[in-house]
């Protein structure tokens, strides 16, 4: 019998309702806002069969992707082999996590500037840091108490200010501060110092400035500006590292699911959505779009995570298509 975590059906049902609503809007052509409707098509192409999987491996929902300093690509999925590593040419290196309860609520992975891998688990309410040797170096959050399942739909059911309630993503400031988008339950952003001490949190469920409805992804730019994918409100919110509100961007036709931000002096943000990827500058202008909804190669189905090691390369984790795509500029 397949073991299922009691928290996941609620999460997936909520995501399904959100995606169906967004898809209806996208297919009808209604709700196009701002410059997204006028943005050009990005000159990206799919690199077919880039990843060389072991013949016996079958992926589950592909929900995370990250690239380390060596150019190795890490794929996170909800199958029996939850974490896979490929080299820069797409050759399979290893798989990790088979049979581990740690990956029951796998949600996302990131590499910090020191090349440590951070894993976000929405079921255990934990964010786990692994060092370069793959050893657990730090854990933020804690497993929920049994009574939490009985109060799952109650706002603020987790009273500990440093605890999470279905966290979704992580990013880091230049001073080592850690920011967690938290998430399906708490609808806030939590800040920790470089030693892992809780500093502050901001936001609650709502649609006002600084409020969130499922903050699903978070990144920071070279100017130390934070960008939060406020998925349930179909918008992007912008803050400084103290949580002060700066801007809100409403110029995408669908909800933002995932972010990556390119390195280098001229940064851009790639945004994954239901069946499309958007490219934005740091002022929020939509520079281009790519893709349309579908499950055949070249289309996209729930872009749950994106990674962009440079401006001309995007890796897209498609949750419902159960695959990871490599896209490159033509």
Model-found features: residue ranges?
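Bacterial N-terminal signal peptides that target proteins for export
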Residues: 1-11
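Sec/Tat signal peptide C-region and signal peptidase I cleavage site
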Residues: 23-25
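Bacterial N-terminal signal peptides
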Residues: 9-21
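Eukaryotic scaffold repeat domains enriched in small/polar residues
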Residues: 27-330
